[in-house]
Amino acid sequence: MKLSFTTKGWDSVSFDEFCRIACDTGFQGIELHGIDNPMFTSRGGPFSEYSAAATVRKMHETGLSIPCIDAVCDISAEDADAAAAHITECIKKASELRIPYVRVHAAESEDAAAAAAKSRAL
């Protein structure tokens, strides 16, 4: 079994440090929370259009992977259009980086809102 940890809540840690922590502690993966965070996507960031391929290659060489991107939205919220747009962007980025999963979350049990966001995103 492979284990990964999330970057959620670790706003002051660099991606290189995440990789070092994963290797040092025996984790095999890093789950990206907030892929649109400037820490990840700004020029020179590990997942900018210029750096993403090299970052994924470096991770593969060190035995690390990114099992999923965490969508930072609530699919049970009333604004299904905004949630769907964010999920669609996460799916696009996951596809570009060959990340197999996008994780979504629902803070409430609003089945209709969650279903609407899912159908709009897909």
Predicted regions and their residues:
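A generic structural signal for short
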Residues: 6-7, 43-44, 78-79, 111
